[in-house]
């Protein structure tokens, strides 16, 4: 049980173990038993990393044979611009060996991550595009430069995307799947967010390219390790295609605080991918959520058509900007459209705006600050210690 695990790990700390076991999440976090994310220290070479992984695999195999456990061992490796680590299913003896390796920086327990909430209201009007292109509320016209993100790629890290939907006009492609064996968006969340950031009819960056990165299953849930694997894919894909500096990423998802999740999105942002993330939908301080609490990324809260904070939206000093998130209409899998609400809907407005601005020459690394400068100070009751600035395309 988690209580026993906490005592067990406290014993490690008392023994002055070289690596730190990071406590993360909040009281409602859903931990995945015996699953761990291991992060190596900066400067550990590729050769040393491979040697460590091989050693851990051997230790796990020995311990499994000795004790007859059903642990699976090493599951996946990460390398995001030399930020190296892995995810595995290990027994306590193997975990102790990992924590005592001087090359390991920290270990944290894997946890469940979910889409950042949604409410569906069929037939509600669409208003977000008009709002982010006017200083005053009320316009239904979306005014934008016709470049509209041309030459920029947006990675949708979500439940998958219906890449054949008519709203994408052939600009969407499949990337990878770290969630399950079904490369379809059975939920609809990922298709909706992609349509918001780059749909022809419903999107901000109407000419941007779209990549489907499935990290959440049909019930809208996944794991921190799966999210990191998806981010790892995005950075490596952008690097291989030579589009670092011409790419954005949207993560309309979240879980309890995770240093590994925050470190992964920070590496992606620093590599030259503009990262927009949902603040979360619990009407709580976003500092307790990841990746929303990562300082390097653009954390987005949700606003209503009346320029008020959406009742569900998280808030706090880590929020960078507000964007429309209540009653947003966009594409659904199989054709047509539907309406959803959530910070999940606000974040892709910012991801799309990021791609739009990158297409006009903006640097992804400083883009969140630029968006905050352009934003309209319009939000009523934004929340304690929270910005009142609403996304605007300048």
From Swiss-Prot:
Enzyme class: hydrolase
GO CC field: extracellular region
Alphabetized SUPFAM superfamilies for the sequence: Protease propeptides/inhibitors (SSF54897), Subtilisin-like (SSF52743)
Gene Ontology BP terms: proteolysis
Compartments where located: Secreted
Alphabetical UniProt keywords: Glycoprotein, Hydrolase, Protease, Secreted, Serine protease, Signal, Virulence, Zymogen
MF-aspect GO terms: serine-type endopeptidase activity
Active site: 158 (charge relay system), 189 (charge relay system), 344 (charge relay system)
InterPro entries per UniProt: PCSK9_ProteinaseK-like, Peptidase_S8/S53_dom, Peptidase_S8/S53_dom_sf, Peptidase_S8_Ser-AS, Peptidase_S8_subtilisin-like, Peptidase_S8_subtilisin-rel, S8pro/Inhibitor_I9, S8pro/Inhibitor_I9_sf
Enzyme Commission code: 3.4.21.-
Inhibitor I9 domain segment(s): 36-115
Residues covered by the Peptidase S8 domain: 126-394
Ion transport keyword on record: no
Propeptide: 18-116
Positions annotated as glycosylated: 100, 250, 306
Signal peptide: 1-17
UniProt xrefs under Pfam families: Inhibitor_I9, Peptidase_S8
Family membership: Belongs to the peptidase S8 family.
Protein function: Secreted subtilisin-like serine protease with keratinolytic activity that contributes to pathogenicity.
Entries under PANTHER family matching the protein: CEREVISIN-RELATED, PEPTIDASE S8
Protein name stated in the entry: Subtilisin-like protease 4
Lineage, uppermost ranks: Eukaryota, Fungi, Dikarya, Ascomycota, Pezizomycotina
Encoding gene, per UniProt annotation: SUB4
